[in-house]
């Protein structure tokens, strides 16, 4: 029988198939751990590994093949909880992982932490709601119905609607390429991803204004095409994209670095292209981290102030977001309108936190399965 060359030696398959047996390998009885259902065969058919991802049972060169025993790896929920920044501290609600507060030193430290959080976070947050409804709900609703208020809300939602999907796609592609490939300048490129974290948003707005303004590098090109960047929605979107760029990619890189690649390699062995591997294998493994990064990106996009303030010019009724509306109304001593906008921003923040909690609970629940 003619020998067949197999193209996946990394999977533990032989490079030649000889006449002695279909794979020239001795059959070693062992328990198949790839599927939850009991198997009637005493040999592990590793096509079951791919059955759950490609939706069908397949074989290599028309024959079943023995899969390598996969390396131990964390579950997707554990990776999200342990590797995804703030999720590490929030993902185990009521998990019972801490020690009981059983002495006065621990009680004192807990009390100091609770008092600090209450004074710095909770009291100012609640005071905004108290001030917004101090004169009743009717004045609050009147301010919310103001045309300038509604336009600011519209601009805020539009910025989030544009920047979050773009940074989600970029962050996913960048994270996969940075973790799956080695190339010159990789370390420098990964360092650049953290640049928006270290630069003041006001400086970001100034940089974009100098670059796309009337005397900037692209001034002539922008004049010829009739595109306005400074004091326009385009510039606001660019500024928001810059400050929110690292969130998705930085959430995904630790998960991808700790993910076992055996399933991706097996899928390619069975003929899956890059898109099928991503959609059926990679994406299910990173979905919790991806969703968490999207939530953080959205929260920052809706609350951005400094960069948007510089490049937009804070033009009322044109380039004003809710955060800029709060500043303008407060400076004009229209405190009730400022408090109304602050309450709406706080409500959006609470909604984001609620979604984040649900994501963390779902990830933690899956990790316990």
Curated annotation (Swiss-Prot):
One Gene Ontology CC term in the entry: chloroplast membrane
Transmembrane domains' residue ranges: 110-130, 156-176, 187-207, 229-249, 335-355
Induction pattern: Up-regulated by sulfate deprivation.
Region (Disordered): 1-21
Keyword line: Chloroplast, Membrane, Plastid, Sulfate transport, Transit peptide, Transmembrane, Transmembrane helix, Transport
CDD domains named in the record: TM_PBP2
Subunit (UniProt): Part of the chloroplast sulfate permease holocomplex. May form a heterodimer with SLUP1.
Function comment: Part of the ABC-type chloroplast envelope-localized sulfate transporter.
Protein name in the entry: Sulfate permease 2, chloroplastic
């Amino acid at each position: 029988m003619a020998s067949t060359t197999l193209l996946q030696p990394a999977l533990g398959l032989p490079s030649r198939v000889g006449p002695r047996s279909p794979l020239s390998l001795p059959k070693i009885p062992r328990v198949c751990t790839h599927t939850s259902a009991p198997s009637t065969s005493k040999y592990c058919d590793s096509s079951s590994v791919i059955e759950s991802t490609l939706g069908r049972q397949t074989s290599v060169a028309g024959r079943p093949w023995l899969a390598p025993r996969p390396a131990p790896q964390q579950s997707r929920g554990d990776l999200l909880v342990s590797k995804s920044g703030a999720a590490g501290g929030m993902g185990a609600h009521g998990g019972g992982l801490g020690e009981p507060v059983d002495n006065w030193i621990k009680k004192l430290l807990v009390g100091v932490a609770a008092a600090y959080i209450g004074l710095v976070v909770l009291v100012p947050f609640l005071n905004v709601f108290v001030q917004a409804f101090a004169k009743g709900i009717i004045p609050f609703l009147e301010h919310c119905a103001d045309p300038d208020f509604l336009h600011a809300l519209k601009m805020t939602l539009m910025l989030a609607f544009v920047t979050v999907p773009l940074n989600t796609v970029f962050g996913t592609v960048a994270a996969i390429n940075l973790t799956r490939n080695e190339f010159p300048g990789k370390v420098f490129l990964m360092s650049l991803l953290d640049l928006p974290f270290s630069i003041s948003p006001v400086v970001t707005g100034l940089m974009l204004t100098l670059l796309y303004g009337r005397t900037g590098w692209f001034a002539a090109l922008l004049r010829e095409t009739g595109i306005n960047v400074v004091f326009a929605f385009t510039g606001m979107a660019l500024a928001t994209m810059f400050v929110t760029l690292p969130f998705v990619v930085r959430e995904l890189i630790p998960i991808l670095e700790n993910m076992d690649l055996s399933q991706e390699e097996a899928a390619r062995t069975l003929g899956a292209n890059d898109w099928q591997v991503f959609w059926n294998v990679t994406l299910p493994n990173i979905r919790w981290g991806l969703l968490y990064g999207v939530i953080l990106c959205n929260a920052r996009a809706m609350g951005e102030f400094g960069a948007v303030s510089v490049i937009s010019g804070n033009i009322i009724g044109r380039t004003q977001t809710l955060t800029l509306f709060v500043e303008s109304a407060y400076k004009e001593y229209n405190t009730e309108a400022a408090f109304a906008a602050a309450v709406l921003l706080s409500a959006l923040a609470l909604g984001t936190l609620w979604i984040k909690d649900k994501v963390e609970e779902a990830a933690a629940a899956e990790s316990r399965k």
